[in-house]
C-alpha cells in the first residue's frame, strides 16, 4: 500500500462513476485515515519540510481558488438523484480549496467533510466527465463544510499565483498532458528533477542509475 496509515484496499461503490469522479479513491481513503494527516496528490513533489506551514493550523491547503463559473458553477448545474439536497448551511460564496496537498488535524471535521463529499458523489446522476463535479466534491465542499463549522482554512500560499515563485513544491497539474505526449519535454523535465535531487539531496547517490534519469 502507499498510505503510511496502513490503508491496504479502497472500495469505491459502483454507483460512483469513475469517469466523473476520477479522484474518488482519495476521499474514500481519507475516510479510513486517522487525523492528523496530510493528503498529497501523486503529481505533487514536496521538496521542503512543511512543518512550519502546518504548525498550529487545523486545516491547511496549498491555496484557495477563485469561483470561476466554468469550473465552479452554481447548484442548478448538478444532476442529482431525487431526494438529495444541498445543505442550506453551505455558503456558495466560500472560495474553493486546492487540495493537491491538504493537512487536517480534526477527526470529527474530517468525517463531516468526507461524508458530505461521498454523499454527493453517491447521489450524482452525471455519467460524463466534466471536471465540475469532481472539484465540487473535493475542493468546493471542503470550503463549504469548513465555513459551516466555523473552521479556518490556512494556506501555504495566499494566492494561486504565488505557487509559481516558490521552491517548496512542484505541482505538475495540467503539465502532465504535455509530458505525456512530448518525449523531449519529458527528458528535460526529468533532467531538471535529477539535478535538483543531486543538489539538495546528495545522499541519494543512486538517482542517476535510474533509467528515467539516463
Which residue ranges define each predicted feature?
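Short, polar loop motifs at secondary-structure junctions
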Residues: 1, 42-48, 158-160
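Structural alpha-beta junctions
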Residues: 2-8, 147-155, 199-204
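Conserved catalytic core of nucleotide-sugar-dependent glycosyltransferases
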Residues: 54-122
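C-terminal catalytic/acceptor-binding lobe
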Residues: 159-214
Amino acid at each position: 500500500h502507499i498510505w503510511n496509515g496502513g490503508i491496504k484496499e479502497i472500495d469505491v461503490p459502483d454507483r460512483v462513476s469513475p469517469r466523473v469522479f476520477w479522484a474518488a479513491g482519495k476521499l474514500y481513503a481519507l475516510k479510513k485515515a486517522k487525523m492528523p494527516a496530510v493528503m498529497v496528490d501523486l503529481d505533487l513533489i514536496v521538496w521542503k519540510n512543511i512543518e512550519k506551514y502546518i504548525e498550529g493550523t487545523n486545516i491547511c491547503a496549498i491555496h484557495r481558488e477563485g469561483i470561476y463559473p466554468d469550473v465552479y458553477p452554481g447548484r442548478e448545474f448538478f444532476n442529482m438523484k431525487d431526494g438529495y439536497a444541498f445543505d442550506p448551511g453551505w455558503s456558495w460564496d466560500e472560495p474553493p480549496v486546492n487540495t493537491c496537498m491538504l493537512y487536517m488535524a480534526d477527526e470529527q471535521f474530517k468525517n463531516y467533510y468526507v461524508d458530505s463529499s461521498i454523499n454527493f458523489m453517491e447521489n450524482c446522476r452525471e455519467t460524463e466527465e466534466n471536471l465540475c463535479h469532481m472539484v465540487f466534491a473535493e475542493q468546493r465542499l471542503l470550503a463549504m463544510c469548513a465555513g459551516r463549522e466555523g473552521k479556518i482554512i490556512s494556506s501555504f500560499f495566499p494566492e494561486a499565483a504565488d505557487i509559481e515563485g516558490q521552491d517548496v513544491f512542484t505541482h505538475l497539474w495540467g503539465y502532465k498532458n504535455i509530458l505525456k505526449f512530448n518525449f523531449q519535454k519529458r527528458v528535460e523535465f526529468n533532467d531538471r528533477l535529477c539535478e535538483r535531487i543531486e543538489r539538495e539531496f546528495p545522499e541519494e547517490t543512486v538517482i542517476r542509475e535510474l533509467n528515467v534519469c539516463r
